Each structure stands twice: as C-alpha cells, then as structure tokens.
C-alpha cells in the first residue's frame, strides 16, 4: 500500500491536519507527525540548539518539539523502516500564495520531503472563518492520486491553495504561477502590562500581481490553485548579465 507522511505547521492538534489525515487514510497508509505547537511562519528552519522530543498521542499522531522541517526530517529518517512514498503538508489555516511561500512552514515541510528525494504536496485553505477543510481534503486526495500516476520532476513540489467554499461551489482546478504582494505593512507598536514597548508584525501587503494565471486570481475566482514550485532558486536568466560585471571587479 502507498505510504504517506502527513505533517503541517499549525501544530499537531490543528483541525487541518486531522481532516487531511482522515481523508488520506481511507485510501493509503498514513503516518501523521507534526509540531507540538503552532509554527506558522517557520519557513525551512531547523532546530539546532536543542534535542527533539516526541510524544505519541492517543490518536496515533506523533508530536515533535520542533519545526515542520524537523518533523518531516525526523519522521523519514527515524520512523520508517522503508521511506514513505509521498509527503503531504497541511491543511494550512490560511493562504500560502505568492511571496507567502517563502515564509510558510507548510510549504517548507513539503520542501523537506523533496530534499530527501520524495514527491511532496503542500495544501492550504484560503479565506476567513475557515470551515471547509473537507473541501481541501477532497482535493488533496485527488491531487495525491494524480501525482502517483504522473510524477513530477525531482526538484519540484506542488503548492495547492483551496478556496474556503463548499465542495459543490468549487469551479475547478487551475495550474498557476505565483502572484506577488506589495511590501508588508509596518510593525504594530504597543506596550505590555509593565509599560515596556513591544512590537507585533503588521499585516501582509496587498496583492500586487493577482492577474489571470496567478494563484491569487484562481482562488479569488473560486478555483483550486496548483502551483509547481522548484527547489532551485537560481535566477538563471541573470547569470550572464551579472557574470559580465562581476568578472571585471
């Protein structure tokens, strides 16, 4: 039977990871390993200064005192006699589109699976008052089945964003590119109860490139967005231009 490792960045008790695990378990052998707390925005960070501790929960899930990347790395290296076939990360509570992908622990967990040589998918539910995790789980199962039948390149993952809509209101699936946001808003300056100055991150920037073909556009119009992401961040088209002046230094 196909073996799937499920992880996330919202934490092992988040509703999204349960919805995803339960849906996939109807068709595949599933192991669920996630952080013991919310690690949203953790990106690809690893825990290097402390040991990782694990705790097996009553439902069979395994919590880890680390980041999403830690969870996937640990699970693949230590919890399987034979590696899983696919890594699926999610279902994230909120969008991972455009620039968000660089900060996302959800995307990072999938990337770690890819770094270790496995096909991987990150899936997120987009909207306010999130409640349609079943819709995202349904599409996760469909996309996993498609990935099994039609593998993608070894340096890529699929980043999936699903509108927060009932299943019968989804218009279809679109293969997209990443959109882009304007610069993030400023910090929020406050005082703690002792009168000391503290800062919170402000809201993300508004959508700058949400044109047709982007993930932003697809989701805003009721479509599931599937964006292939590459692990290699090299801007190949810039190499000749930069090489010209670098070699003159």
From Swiss-Prot:
Question: Which InterPro entries does the record associate with it?
Answer: SurE, SurE-like_Pase/nucleotidase, SurE-like_sf
Query: The organism sits in which domain of life?
Result: Bacteria
Annotated Gene Ontology MF terms? 3'-nucleotidase activity; 5'-nucleotidase activity; exopolyphosphatase activity; metal ion binding; nucleotide binding
Q: Which reaction does it catalyse?
A: a ribonucleoside 5'-phosphate + H2O = a ribonucleoside + phosphate
What is this protein's name? Answer: 5'-nucleotidase SurE
Alphabetical GO CC annotations of the entry are:
cytoplasm
Chief subcellular location equals: cytoplasm
Where on this chain does a divalent metal cation bind?
9-10, 40, 92
Q: Which family does it belong to?
A: Belongs to the SurE nucleotidase family.
Its annotated function is as follows: Nucleotidase that shows phosphatase activity on nucleoside 5'-monophosphates.
Record gene name: surE
How, per the record, is the cofactor bound? Binds 1 divalent metal cation per subunit.
Alphabetical keyword list: Cytoplasm, Hydrolase, Metal-binding, Nucleotide-binding
Cofactor names: a divalent metal cation
Query: Where's it found, cell-wise?
Result: Cytoplasm
Recorded E.C. number(s)?
3.1.3.5
């Amino acid at each position: 039977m196909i073996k799937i490792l499920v992880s996330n960045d919202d934490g092992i008790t988040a509703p999204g990871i349960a919805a995803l695990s339960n849906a996939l378990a109807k068709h595949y052998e599933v192991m669920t390993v996630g952080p013991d707390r919310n690690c949203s925005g953790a990106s690809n960070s690893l825990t290097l200064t402390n040991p990782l501790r694990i705790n097996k929960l009553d439902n069979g899930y395994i919590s880890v005192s680390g980041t999403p990347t830690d969870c996937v790395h640990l699970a693949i290296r230590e919890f399987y006699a034979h590696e899983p076939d696919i890594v699926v990360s999610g279902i994230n509570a909120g969008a991972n589109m455009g620039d968000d992908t660089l900060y996302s622990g959800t995307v990072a967990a999938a990337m770690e699976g890819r770094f270790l040589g496995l096909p991987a998918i990150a899936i997120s539910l987009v909207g306010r008052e999130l409640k349609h995790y079943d819709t995202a789980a349904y599409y996760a199962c469909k996309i996993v089945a498609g990935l099994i039948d039609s593998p993608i390149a070894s340096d890529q993952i699929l980043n999936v964003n699903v509108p927060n809509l009932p299943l019968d209101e989804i218009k279809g699936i679109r293969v997209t590119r990443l959109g882009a946001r304007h610069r993030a808003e400023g910090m929020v300056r406050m005082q703690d109860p002792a009168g000391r100055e503290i800062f919170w991150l402000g809201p993300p920037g508004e959508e700058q490139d949400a044109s047709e073909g982007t993930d932003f556009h697809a989701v805003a119009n009721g479509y599931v967005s599937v964006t292939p992401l590459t692990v290699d961040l090299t801007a190949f088209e810039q190499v000749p231009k930069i090489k010209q002046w670098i070699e003159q230094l």
